[in-house]
């Protein structure tokens, strides 16, 4: 789980760019994308999911707070999750990043 603070509000409100970043992050992890869906909220904010064969990546943004909450979840320990996390944090250029790791199962 990632919490990104102090991000650019314009980027956090750009559904197409967020979709591109999240799908590319799945590819960087060497995951197989099954489908994706993103939604833009008025007046601002984006939520989205990239369903991968191995589980999912999700994002919820609050541009008015410069904040994004992101989950990178997988049931395949062979995926390159750290590559996905690094890519996401670089693309959003957050001033403050908090990572939480949760082992399930």
Swiss-Prot record:
The record marks 54-55 as: Cleavage (non-hydrolytic). SUPFAM superfamilies: S-adenosylmethionine decarboxylase. Its cofactor is pyruvate. It catalyses: S-adenosyl-L-methionine + H(+) = S-adenosyl 3-(methylsulfanyl)propylamine + CO2. Binds 1 pyruvoyl group covalently per subunit. Its EC number is 4.1.1.50. It holds the Pfam family AdoMet_dc. GO terms for biological process: spermidine biosynthetic process. Is synthesized initially as an inactive proenzyme. Formation of the active enzyme involves a self-maturation process in which the active site pyruvoyl group is generated from an internal serine residue via an autocatalytic post-translational modification. Two non-identical subunits are generated from the proenzyme in this reaction, and the pyruvate is formed at the N-terminus of the alpha chain, which is derived from the carboxyl end of the proenzyme. One of its GO terms (molecular function) is adenosylmethionine decarboxylase activity. Pathway: Amine and polyamine biosynthesis; S-adenosylmethioninamine biosynthesis; S-adenosylmethioninamine from S-adenosyl-L-methionine: step 1/1. It comes from the Bacteria. Keywords: Autocatalytic cleavage, Decarboxylase, Lyase, Polyamine biosynthesis, Pyruvate, S-adenosyl-L-methionine, Schiff base, Spermidine biosynthesis, Zymogen. The modification Pyruvic acid (Ser) is found at residue 55. The active site is at residues 55, 60, 75. GO terms for cellular component: cytosol. Belongs to the prokaryotic AdoMetDC family. Type 1 subfamily. Heterotetramer of two alpha and two beta chains arranged as a dimer of alpha/beta heterodimers. Catalyzes the decarboxylation of S-adenosylmethionine to S-adenosylmethioninamine (dcAdoMet), the propylamine donor required for the synthesis of the polyamines spermine and spermidine from the diamine putrescine. This is S-adenosylmethionine decarboxylase proenzyme 1. It comes from Halalkalibacterium halodurans (strain ATCC BAA-125 / DSM 18197 / FERM 7344 / JCM 9153 / C-125) (Bacillus halodurans).
């Amino acid at each position: 789980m990632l919490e990104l603070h102090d991000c650019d509000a314009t980027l956090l409100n750009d559904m197409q760019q967020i979709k591109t970043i999240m799908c590319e992050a799945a590819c960087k992890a060497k995951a197989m994308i099954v489908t994706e869906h993103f939604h833009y909220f008025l007046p601002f904010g984006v939520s989205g999911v990239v369903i991968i064969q191995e589980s999912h990546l999700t994002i919820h943004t609050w541009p008015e707070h410069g904040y994004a909450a992101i989950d990178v979840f997988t049931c395949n320990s062979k995926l390159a999750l750290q590559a996905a996390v690094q890519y996401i944090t670089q693309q959003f250029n957050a001033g403050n990043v908090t990572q939480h790791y949760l082992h399930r199962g």
